[in-house]
Amino acid sequence: MLTRVALHGGVGGPTTFRAGRGLVGYTIERVVRVSATSARLTFRHDGGDVHVEVPCGPRPLVPLDTLDQEHVSLTPRVKSLLTTMLQLHSLGRDICMVPATLDAEMRSQASSSKSTCIHLFAALLGYPVETIWLWKDVSGTELLMRRATTPSGATIWEPAPLTLSALRGSLVHLAGVHVLGPTLESLSRLTQDREMELWDGTRLTTDADVPLSNELVDGHVCRMAPNVRIIATAPQIGDWLSEGVANMFATLAAPPMTADEERAVVRQQSGVSETALDPVWAFVHKYRTQASDANVGLHKARRFGTRQLIRIARRLARWPDDDVYRLLFRNQLCDFLPRTVRDIVHQMLLDVGIAPHGSEGAFQYKPPLRLSAPVVEAGTLAFFDESGKPVLRVPRYDWRSKDPEGASLIPNAHGSFFHNTQQTGLMHSIVQDLETLDEHLLLMGAQGTGKNKIMDQVLELLDRPREYIQMNRDLSLIHI
């Protein structure tokens, strides 16, 4: 039935996204500021251009023809999504972006560019973006207000980031709304009527006959910024997308990248050569195909998204001789998978010609990297292999000019760290990700394997201050 009415690929179908068009065949052509809080959108169409005046933010508008310079790839699919978002915005609707599920051609684990489109949308309309990451136990009250303590020890209510954004006219990105379940419907008054009921009779509404202000007045009716917009995102569709939620938001199904688009984006963002990426692409295609089969067991393993591909590609662009097997095995957290699933991933890597260094065979043998102890010299941290050949050199952190107060936070092992090849190899990998690629790290391992010791040694060698926070199960996000 869907095929007969051309809806088997979702609203507009895949042809619309490949052509870069929005709803009903329109394409965004130009965005021009009209006043401090409004802009004029020009949509191009074969039947004639359409001009619409819409709310906008206070920041300078980024011209449409310069969006490619914002470190993103403005592909036809992204431009189609962006045009559709602007059309829904011109109708005064908040948006809920979910991955498309109807198009069998594009079933994959590739990115659907939801976050990228949100930031492009904000750049075009001059909105500051307030991203609010949601978690399962948050209540409707916590979304709007939270408890705080004054210097005298008294507890008071204060506005949550969502309320402050509504007060100041920001673009709110509610990330992961699927975890809220029925709690999401507690925001219906905000999305549909632009009203919020707060503490002690304090109300926020766009109809208030008072001047706009960045501060709330307790017990009074305050004016909400008329240009506030909310965009919710979720990685999957489920029971949370009820009839009530569908009335709150205009739902936009974002299709994932095709294989050709994803490959072009990864190459553009990383600069990696085509030949270096070929075996990785072969593995990714095989992994995603197997992960869609619940009988294999990979459906519970870590998905292989586009962001992970870009991270791996950046490493290969910088160090082409890196151990690809180790990178992929570590990226998918295979050490924490069941033995049978781990063996499946291992066999898939071998099937596409990716083997760990030291096991390729007599004619393709690549010895594993064995490092000597790292050396600090001339303001840099240097790693050498056992033959004395330099492998990596990075500048140490200049805390004297960047963070003078952090000198006391630099770890000092007082010479109690003893070098061995395995730990030095791990430190080498940490320095690559932390200093050269500017990545955040998650170091996982059983208790007593030296995680803290290794990180302290890395930071001591880099001369970087460390802020240590001991986590426990009773620690809430607000406390952090």
Residue ranges and their predicted role:
Residues 1-75, 79-83, 226-229, 257-431, ...:
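Alpha-helical lid/collar subdomain of P-loop NTPases
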Residues 94-134, 440-472:
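Walker A/P-loop
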Residues 127, 239-260, 464:
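A short helix-turn-beta junction within AAA+ P-loop NTPase domains corresponding to the substrate/partner-engaging
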Residues 132-135, 250-261, 469-473:
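Conserved AAA+ ATPase "SRH/arginine-finger" region at the nucleotide-binding site
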Residues 148, 179-224:
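Conserved catalytic/switch belt of AAA+ P-loop NTPases
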Residues 173-175, 199, 228-235:
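Structural recognition of the conserved hydrophobic beta-strand(s) that form the central parallel beta-sheet
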Residues 478-480:
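Conserved small/polar residues in nucleotide/adenosyl-binding loops
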